């Protein structure tokens, strides 16, 4: 049974979003090449999806009592409507009512120089947007281009690209803006608190534990190893599997651009689970996994009936298990598969 669980999970976990799986979770590790934050003792705090407002306020209270410093990292998916070059010519446009989705990070500009170069920090203060290299390649972007964006609040903004930097430096987000611009785009959620001081002692942890009532948090200190969850960031997902425009349906379900869907999504009869609708790239690894299940005599542990009713692979929607800031589920690409989602069968994958 353990072999089955481990083998099938390796298919899904590589592409699916877990509770703590958001781009930028390794913020501190990705930015140690810059002068600033590495000169301090650092505590980072995160929780599934978003830091509750109550947790945020309790962190602020703790930091005030300790005399330390804190900044909050924000994140949400916003819409890309069009791209204009330096002469205001449209180099990219979307179909009516459709948008591309950009995973965007926010940071307080007054603390940006602790995590980024002086150049990037100054560009953020000038209200410009920083874009990752993979994202620039995906949409043929150049520094100086203007992005016409639709925020979480449906407000349309036009931002100039200040610089294109490696994805690892941006924390594997697609774009980076200041908190000020983030608020204008409706990005009000925080995914991570970063606390720093010249020396962190046990008093810091006592104060945090005393004040923060919600205990299901992930707390790292100094060189704590990041959570290796194998989740591909959005920029790599798009690089490997392509990108598509989306149209909103009800806040959770979306309509995927028909051209991309017709070229990439297929239905096939599979052993054990029956008919499945997935990204065509998934057939080979999925078939290999299911054949191994059969070879080991474990096919009775998977429920075909439940897969047909409640499981599946391709499901164009946003993640709604927690406040995920409009993140697009890996199911929208047809690269995640759910089996045994409701029954007492083990394992649930």
Each language-model region and where it sits:
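Second-shell loop/turn segments in exported
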Residues: 48, 125-126, 268-280, 325-326, ...
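Short, surface-exposed glycine/acidic/tryptophan-bearing loops
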Residues: 315-343
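Sec-dependent N-terminal signal peptides of Gram-positive bacterial secreted proteins and lipoproteins
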Residues: 4-20
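Acidic helix-start/capping segments at beta-turn-to-alpha-helix junctions
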Residues: 302-320
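Alpha-helical transmembrane segments
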Residues: 17-40
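Basic-flanked hydrophobic alpha-helices used for secretion and membrane insertion
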Residues: 36-41, 51-70, 75-223
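Sec/Tat-exported extracytoplasmic proteins
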Residues: 139, 151, 290-297, 343
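Active-site acidic/histidine clusters and adjacent loop/turn architecture
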Residues: 236, 240-306
């Amino acid at each position: 049974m353990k072999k089955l669980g481990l083998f099938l999970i390796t298919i899904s976990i590589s592409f699916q979003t877990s509770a703590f799986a958001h781009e930028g979770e390794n913020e501190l590790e990705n930015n140690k090449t810059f002068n600033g934050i590495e000169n301090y003792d650092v505590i980072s705090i995160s929780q599934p999806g978003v830091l509750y407002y109550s947790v945020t306020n309790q962190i602020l209270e703790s930091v005030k009592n300790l005399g330390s410093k804190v900044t909050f990292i924000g994140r949400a998916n916003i819409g890309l409507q069009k791209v204009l070059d330096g002469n205001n010519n449209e180099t990219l446009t979307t179909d009516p009512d459709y948008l591309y989705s950009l995973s965007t990070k926010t940071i307080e500009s007054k603390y940006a120089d602790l995590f980024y170069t002086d150049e990037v920090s100054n560009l953020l203060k000038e209200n410009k947007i920083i874009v990752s290299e993979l994202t620039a390649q995906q949409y043929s972007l150049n520094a100086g281009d203007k992005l016409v964006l639709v925020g979480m609040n449906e407000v349309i903004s036009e931002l100039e690209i200040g610089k294109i930097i490696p994805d690892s430096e941006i924390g594997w987000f697609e774009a980076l803006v200041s908190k000020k611009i983030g608020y204008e785009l409706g990005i009000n959620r925080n995914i991570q608190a970063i606390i720093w001081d010249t020396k962190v002692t046990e008093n810091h942890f006592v104060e945090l534990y005393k004040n923060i009532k919600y205990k299901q948090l992930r707390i790292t200190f100094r060189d704590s190893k990041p959570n290796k969850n194998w989740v591909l960031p959005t920029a790599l997902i798009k690089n490997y599997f392509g990108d598509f425009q989306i149209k909103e349906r009800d806040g959770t379900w979306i309509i995927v651009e028909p051209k991309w869907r017709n070229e990439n999504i297929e239905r096939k009869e599979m052993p054990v689970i029956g008919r499945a609708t997935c990204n065509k790239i998934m057939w080979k690894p999925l078939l290999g996994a299911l054949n191994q299940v059969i070879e080991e005599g474990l096919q009775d542990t998977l429920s075909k009936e439940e897969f047909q009713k409640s499981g599946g692979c391709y499901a164009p929607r946003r993640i709604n298990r927690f406040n995920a800031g409009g993140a697009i589920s890996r199911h929208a690409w047809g690269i995640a598969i759910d089996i045994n989602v409701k029954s007492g069968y083990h394992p649930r994958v």
